[in-house]
Swiss-Prot record:
The lineage of its organism: Eukaryota, Metazoa, Spiralia, Lophotrochozoa, Mollusca. The modification 4-hydroxyproline is found at residues 34, 104. Residues 25-29, 52-94 form a propeptide. GO terms for molecular function: hormone activity; toxin activity. It comes from Conus geographus (Geography cone). Keywords: Amidation, Carbohydrate metabolism, Cleavage on pair of basic residues, Disulfide bond, Gamma-carboxyglutamic acid, Glucose metabolism, Hormone, Hydroxylation, Secreted, Signal, Toxin. It holds the Pfam family Insulin. This is Con-Ins G1b. GO terms for biological process: glucose metabolic process. SMART domains: IlGF. Venom insulins constitute about 1/25 of the total venom of C.geographus.
Length: 115
């Protein structure tokens, strides 16, 4: 192989490096760039962004506290009725998975789901 071939190969490599370094900075992410979070990324983001915030679904829905927080005991029949009734609670379908997994969301939008 001739020296002109090596020179051409080095010139192309250098050109690719310069193009990558100059155009690659356009797609960098900042801290609050919207991104998709699915699966374990939702849990990790929740632990990072919602540190020490309580998430109580009963308070958000305006319903009573869970059975384990009440003072008295319920009969088995009443406990079963409450448990089965909680299964049919209406859902609005706009949870964190629908919002941040199916389309990208920023950290500020994700924090709205913190307790």
């Amino acid at each position: 192989m001739t020296t002109s071939f090596y020179f051409l190969l080095m010139a192309l490599g250098l050109l690719l490096y310069v193009c990558q370094s100059s155009f690659g900075n356009q797609h960098t992410r900042t801290f609050d760039t919207p991104k998709h979070r699915c699966g374990s990324e939702i849990t990790n983001s929740y632990m990072d962004l919602c540190y020490r915030k309580r998430n109580d679904a009963g308070e958000k829905r305006g319903r009573a506290s869970p059975l384990w927080q009440r003072r008295g005991f319920l009969s088995k029949l009443k406990a079963r009725a409450k448990r089965n009734g909680a299964f049919h609670l209406p859902r609005d379908g706009r949870g964190v998975v629908e919002h941040c997994c199916h389309r990208p969301c920023s950290n500020a939008e994700f924090r709205k789901y913190c307790g």
